[in-house]
Curated annotation (Swiss-Prot):
Keywords: Metal-binding, Repeat, Transcription, Transcription regulation, Zinc, Zinc-finger. Sequence repeats lie at residues 149-232, 243-324. This is Transcription initiation factor IIB. The keyword Zinc applies. A zinc finger (TFIIB-type) spans 33-64. One of its GO terms (cellular component) is transcription preinitiation complex. Transmembrane segments: none annotated. It comes from the Archaea. Belongs to the TFIIB family.
Length: 333
């Protein structure tokens, strides 16, 4: 009687396990041949979870033992059911795919914000270097991971949505592939990529606000932003001042009526042609300031300037321009 399986070379067969829609197992060898029970020739098996054994459904012969079933515990009969029941898949975000973890902060301060002494500071610098070296090998990977860590820090500090960080990482990757980062600081280029990403996602943040949370200067970030615009051929939409209103109102806890009035003011200003060439954050702050005065909320211009990330002078100038062009009569506090 001939064996139903390929001749053995003395080594245990390596079998690939497939599961059909009825829950039965079929075994396939490395050469692609269907494995059959050596006793009865059957090609369907079941898995004994208690013993870790693959057993023939006809004669009960154990064909594989001490085996871990790495497949799912659920059954599915269609591809749609498999997709619904599967609990694994590709990384949900680029940050996860890059295996980002916590990092040692660059500010050299303890948990209470106190400056570290010189001995401890030198130790932290050394640990920070080794942490970076241990995680990646090539200079490309090290640079990208540093940028990803910087963007994650900015996201945590500024409360920026993850989609913006994802977009910023993609922009930075393109800049890295074109060698635009060479000779420039990672912090400045990452901040510029984030500024661009926020505008592309229609969730803009003022450049001055972004600069407050990074080590790079405003001039460096602005220069890197212009470089990205020029070299990557990215079309960045002109920032709509109304996109800044909800965030300003949220920070100052303003009512929905104030928000509605501020949006109406900006729409009228846009029709009048007085918004072109103006800082959108400053226009939004001035519009919200006017709207709050109209609704009896007499806060200072400084409050709105801080919330919008602009100066008091900007709010004052935009306020005067809007009030004059739209003939709005409100008292100035």
């Amino acid at each position: 009687m001939t064996s139903p399986n390929p001749p053995s070379s003395g080594k245990p067969l390596k079998l690939r396990i497939n599961r059909d829609s009825e829950g039965y197992l079929s075994l396939v060898t490395d050469t692609g041949e269907v494995y059959r029970c050596p006793i009865c020739g059957n090609d369907k098996f079941i898995y004994n979870y208690e013993r870790g054994e693959v057993v023939c459904i006809v004669c009960g012969a154990v064909v594989q033992e001490q085996l871990l079933d790495l497949g799912p515990e659920w059954r599915a009969f269609t591809s749609e059911e498999r997709g619904q029941r599967a609990r694994t898949g590709a990384p949900l975000t680029r940050l996860i795919s890059e295996a980002l973890t916590t990092v040692i902060d660059w500010r050299d301060k303890d948990v209470s914000g106190k400056e570290l002494d010189i001995k401890r500071k030198l130790e932290v610098i050394r640990l920070r270097k080794w942490q970076t070296r241990a995680r990646v090998q090539t200079s490309y990977e090290r640079n990208f991971i540093q940028a990803a860590q910087e963007l994650e820090r900015l996201r945590s500090s500024m409360g920026i949505p993850r989609p913006c960080i994802e977009q910023a990482l993609e922009i930075y990757r393109q800049a890295l592939e074109k060698e635009l980062v060479r000779g420039r600081s990672v912090e400045a280029m990452a901040a510029a990529a984030l500024y661009m990403a926020c505008r592309m996602m229609k969730m803009p943040r003022p450049l001055d606000e972004l600069v407050r949370y990074t080590k790079a200067s405003r001039r460096e970030v602005a220069r890197c932003y212009r470089l990205l615009l020029r070299e990557l051929n990215v079309k960045v939409p002109i920032s709509d001042p109304t996109l800044y209103i909800s965030r300003i109102a949220e920070q100052l806890k303003l009512s929905g009526e104030v928000v509605k009035t501020a949006i109406d003011i900006l729409q009228k200003a846009k029709k009048a042609g007085i918004t072109a060439g103006k800082d959108p954050a400053g226009l939004a702050a001035a519009a919200v300031y006017i709207a709050s005065l109209m609704h009896g909320d007499n806060r200072t211009q400084k409050d709105f300037a801080v919330a919008a990330g602009v100066t008091e002078v900007t709010v004052r100038n935009r306020y005067k321009e809007l009030a004059k062009a739209l003939n709005i009569k409100v008292p100035v506090k």
